[in-house]
Every structure is written in C-alpha cells, then in structure tokens.
Amino acid sequence: MKDLISIINVKDHVGETVKIGAWVADKSGKGKLQFLQLRDGTAFFQAVVFKPNMIEKFGEEEGTAKFDEIKHLSQETSVYVTGVVKEDSRSKFGYELDVTELEVIGHSHDYPITPKEHGVEFLLDNRHLWLRSKRQMAMMQVRNAIIYASYDFFAKNGFIKFDSPILSGNAAENTTELFETDYFGNSAFLSQSGQLYLEAGAMALGRVFDFGPVFRAEKSKTRRHLTEFWMMDAEYPFVTHDESLDIQEAYVKALIQGVLDNAAYALETLERDTSMLQKYIDTPFKRVSYDDAIDLLQAHENDDDTDYEHVEHGDDFGSPHETWISNYYGVPTFIVNYPASFKAFYMKPVPGNPERVLCADLLAPEGYGEIIGGSERETDYDLLLKKIADFGLDPKDYDWYLELRKFGSVPHAGFGLGLERMVTFVAGTEHIREAIPFPRMINRIQP
C-alpha cells in the first residue's frame, strides 16, 4: 500500500501519524499498557498501546474491545498499525510508535519459535521461520548490501555482467568435488565456478563478472563450508597478477564500505565492531608469499599462543594456519604464489619458478579464513594442454577452452569471492550457515 512507511524510515516522521504493515515479534505489558515489538523486514521497534487512548478514540465499548484484542495478539500475527512516531532515547532504535489504531491482517497460532533459547538443529529445521528473527534479518541485510555493492563496484569499473551456465560437461576445479547428474544419457556436472566461461567472455567483451550459485561436493562439516553457495567471479584481459590483486583489494574494501553505508542498523543489531571494518578499509592489505608464510609459521609454531600443526614447504594450509597468519598481520592478507601441485591447472607459473603459480588467496582476519581465490591464467596452448593431461583430465572436454589460446590470447587474470564467507566476515558471526537463506550442508537438504 502506497501510504505505508517502513520501520527503518520512521526517523523521518517524528511527530507525524503514520501507518505501518508489520508482524508482532513479541508482546508484553500489564494493566492499561501493552508493548508490541513490531518487525517489517527493515527493522524492529516498539509500539505502545494505551487503553485510555483507544477509549477516547473509539468510545468505551469499542475501545475496550480493541484493547483486549491487542492484549491477546499472538506472536507473528500480521497487522496494520497507525500511530504517532515519538523519539525514545531508552531504546537502541531511538523511536517508538504511540498507537491510535491497529487492524489484524492475518492470525498466527502456535508459532514454534518462541522467544526463548532453541537448539541450532531445531532452528535449521524451521529455517523458513527462523529467518524472521532479528539476527537473521540483519544477516540477510548484510548479504543484500554486499550484493548491491558488488554490482555497483563492477558497474563503476567497466565490467559487463556475463552469465555462465550452471550445468557443464567439465570441471573447473577438483573433479572429486563434483555433483554429477544425468543429462539425456550423458554426464553433466553442477558448476563449481563460472571462471572458464568467464575467460571466453573476457576475450569477447573485456572486463566481465558473474554472480550465481556454485556447488562443491565436499564432505566437510566445518563452519566455513556449504555444498551450495554463491560466488562472485570476475575476469579481465590485459591484466597481470599484481594488477589483479589491486582490483581485488579495491573490491573487498568497496564491499565493506557498502555495508557500513547501507546496513548500519544490521551491523548494530549484530553488535559488530565497525571500527575494525573501518580499519580494513583504511589499511593496505598485506601481501606475503607462500614460502615466507611457511617460514613464519615454522618460526612461531612453538609459541604459547599457537595451536596449529607443523607445516613444510609444499604443504597446503589448514584453517588454523590461515587463522594464525591473518591474525598475525591484523588485516586481510594475500598469500601469493602457492605450489602448483595443489592449485588448479589453469594457473600461470611464476616466471623462473615453475613449481609456484601466480595465484593468491585472500585471508580475512579474526579467524574467517579464505574469502577470495584468484590467479593469472596460463596463456600458452601447449603448456595448458600438458597441465590438463597432468591433472588426469580429458583434453577433449576442454577443446573450447584451449581454443581461447589459439585466437589472440592475451595476459588475463581473475578471481572468485565466496559471498557467504564475505557475509560471515563482515557480519562478525561464527558460522556460514546463517549467511544464506536456506543453507545446504553435507547433512542438510531441507527445508
């Protein structure tokens, strides 16, 4: 209805009579007063109902009946509420509504998520309702702000949206982590990444980006992993590895700034330390080579505050190693030039050191781990063909990808950012399952 306002905008209507469409999240009161906690998807705030005011407006009989109806409203009843906006210095939100009229739209009976503590599995079983809570609303607002900031960044920097397919006949990353399905008698796979297709887009259109769901059949139960998540991939021609890192750093800072600008209420709800987020914007990201990172870990492995296992040159990092490194530097940190042995086939070797590749993982501080993976791509046809074979892949499946190197190939690079990991990091929350509306994990496919 065009005459409704959102709760988040009541600050612009102090002293005015407004109408709000909302749900009753909670209710309390006694005697002649009732306090309603209202939510509408933008914010939560309090509406105050004073029985004498209802009687004054509607008369003794009707006013009393309306007040009694309000006293018996159940959790999640939907309502139209009319009243006068007042400042309220006692609440974090800063405003409340002095109710003059309330109309019930839809009743709610036996709402399962009552205002008490519930176990995580119960809440996930009722995820379709858990999304209505203040914390989950804030998480979705942070997610939305990051998506909005992504599109804004790419538009301002000359990128074109390029949609890669969800179904593919080949793997972009690790063939052991593919979801396979029947495709009219042939095998097809759910996309792990749009990157290979973005390379084709970059050779046709210049700077391109893609945003969509990707799928990894990882049998992992950590707080950082989902089997279905959303990835923001970008690819750009005529760009080297170091230049790509500059773009990635600017992008991540733009995302954080976008949340600070457009989801401040959500961050306050989540009790996020925004001074830390501002620090990440104001401070240059660190860039550390893989080998220097290994040396650093070895030098500190016997410190009292370390809890990671010993690593050798050639080993991949585990979560404890990533956490320690990023906390050591205190800002987002690029680990560059990993061993080729455990990175993807399409990455270009470091000049003069074929055992290392021109790639980087961006590690977020505060224990959030990798949020971006990127690399400069191999442009030599013969070297790429050999790497495909060395990885045990069938070159025929990559004929079209190899052909990109035949017709005017240029230096190019790109990266992928996991949306849910970025949301978790910016929101300052513990588990990635709260960063997506309906999480898909190794033990959960419903609701």
From Swiss-Prot:
Subunit structure comment from the entry: Homodimer.
Alphabetical keyword list: Aminoacyl-tRNA synthetase, ATP-binding, Cytoplasm, Ligase, Nucleotide-binding, Protein biosynthesis
Family that this chain belongs to: Belongs to the class-II aminoacyl-tRNA synthetase family.
GO biological-process terms attached to the record: asparaginyl-tRNA aminoacylation
Compartments (UniProt record): Cytoplasm
Main enzyme class: ligase
Superkingdom, taxonomy of origin: Bacteria
Protein name, as recorded: Asparagine--tRNA ligase
Organism for this UniProt entry: Lactococcus lactis subsp. cremoris (strain SK11)
GO cellular component: cytoplasm
Lineage: Bacteria, Bacillati, Bacillota, Bacilli, Lactobacillales
